Swiss-Prot record:
A molecular function (GO) term: DNA binding
Highest taxon listed in the record's lineage: Eukaryota
Region Disordered: start-end pairs: 1-63
Compartmental location: Nucleus; Chromosome
Family, per entry: Belongs to the histone H2B family.
Covalent cross-link site, Glycyl lysine isopeptide (Lys-Gly) (interchain with G-Cter in ubiquitin): K151
Keyword Repeat (UniProt): no
InterPro entries: Histone-fold, Histone_H2A/H2B/H3, Histone_H2B, HISTONE_H2B_site
Keywords: Acetylation, Chromosome, DNA-binding, Isopeptide bond, Nucleosome core, Nucleus, Ubl conjugation
Protein's recorded name: Histone H2B.5
Subunit structure comment from the entry: The nucleosome is a histone octamer containing two molecules each of H2A, H2B, H3 and H4 assembled in one H3-H4 heterotetramer and two H2A-H2B heterodimers. The octamer wraps approximately 147 bp of DNA.
Residue positions where N6-acetyllysine is found in the record: K7, K37
Amino acid sequence: MAPKAEKKPAAKKPAEEEPAAEKAEKAPAGKKPKAEKRLPAGKGEKGSGEGKKDRAGRKKAKKSVETYKIYIFKVLKQVHPDIGISSKAMSIMNSFINDIFEKLAAEAAKLARYNKKPTITSREIQTSVRLVLPGELAKHAVSEGTKAVTKFTSA
């Protein structure tokens, strides 16, 4: 909401004295104060602390969006240190990983339900990888997953 314009006092009475701080802020009686330049609503300076606010007047917390972008970049640098990736390609890779994750999680949940187990273990994940991914890709994924689990449990 935009701040309301200040009202000028109608007529000053001689008996009334204002503090020195207030006198310094006000413009001389004969001149109009210059209009301040305002930025569009919600676009304050970076360090000003002004931002979007909710109905109660509190500052809205920025929603964190979790992505795999940093991990994709780390793997890319391990495999091809001299090659970069565009933001569009990074977005596609992030969507791809989210899609595979959802497929594996759904399949693992089905397997746990079929076996009447309340917990998804590494066994359900391994079976879902074999069911979702094709041939050689599934074999490599299972071996890498097994290696990661043994490294995690031994550490």
